[in-house]
């Protein structure tokens, strides 16, 4: 019985660790879909505009959040310390502005609902009908 409990706990942790992150936007956003490369370019500060030329405002979770770790690992294969070091170099050199920090998935959704140029990421399990999914990150 004890072995079964350990096995089930491991399975649950594994399932939670592999949860899919989604990139969302305002339902009236002109952007319907972004490729993985386009999301990388936006979140790594390489571009500040959507492929259609419209301004993009990226939202980011707190520096130490599990959502942020899952998102960047799935998107770039990099760990949070690597992402933080990357941004520290860009900011120090004055070459880019990092995504706007927010405190929670609820704040991502609330900000997106007020700004048609904003995009953010949340866990797929937190998806609500009031936003549009424009990319998947596994």
Residue spans of the language-model regions?
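Exported/periplasmic ABC-transporter solute-binding proteins
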Residues: 20-138
């Amino acid at each position: 019985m004890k072995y079964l409990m350990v096995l089930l706990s491991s399975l649950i942790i594994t399932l939670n660790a592999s949860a899919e992150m989604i990139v969302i936007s305002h339902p009236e956003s002109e952007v319907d879909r972004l490729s993985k490369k386009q999301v990388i370019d936006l979140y790594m500060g390489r571009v500040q505009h959507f492929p259609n030329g419209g301004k993009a405002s990226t939202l980011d979770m707190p520096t130490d959040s599990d959502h942020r770790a899952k998102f960047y690992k799935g998107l770039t294969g990099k760990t949070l310390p690597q992402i933080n070091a990357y941004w520290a170099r860009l900011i120090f050199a004055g070459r880019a502005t990092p995504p706007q920090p927010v405190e929670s998935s609820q704040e991502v959704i609330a900000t997106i609902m007020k700004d048609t140029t904003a995009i953010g990421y949340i866990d797929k399990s937190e998806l609500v009908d009031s936003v549009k999914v424009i990319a998947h990150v596994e």
